[in-house]
Amino acid sequence: MFSIFIDSDSLPKPHRAMVIRRILKDNQYIKACHFASDRVLPDVRDAIEHHTASLRAPLRDTLDKEELRKIRSNIYMYIVETGMNSADDKLVELSETPGFAITHDIPLASRLIEKGLVVLDDRGHELTKENIRARLSERNFMESLRQNGFVSEKTKSFDQRTINEFASAFDSLFNRFVKEFC
């Protein structure tokens, strides 16, 4: 079994929907899935409620209410204070191997890689010990250009191709973890 850690502040809703569908479909392989955000995410909350209900349903006639309440989803949503790196710090605190993370945040990816996790960004690129330094340097350089007014803050939008690339990379990584750890 393995865990998944999701920086859900920056993960687009279509991406979260894909991840949630796969987690619910193949939940038997997952120890825990952790979403960290500075706000309640209705889609994640609904997935937790739905999953908990589906786990309890077959046991309603055999267990009393107290025992049923102990049965809960292994999907967790952490609401952290709004502020710099609060969701990041929570994910780093929770992180454990074997596991992988999903984030757009390059400094967070670097911290998670140091803890032994594989990281996937929201465009479907796998970040590793081998490539994170270059990505971090590029990010820091672009940040300094933005701060000094040389470059305006523009991010490429998510088109269907980008969403498909993420979906394919997520499925491949998930399948790799199932083969390796389950």
Show where each model-derived region lies.
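Nuclease catalytic cores that cleave nucleic-acid phosphodiester bonds
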Residues: 2-182
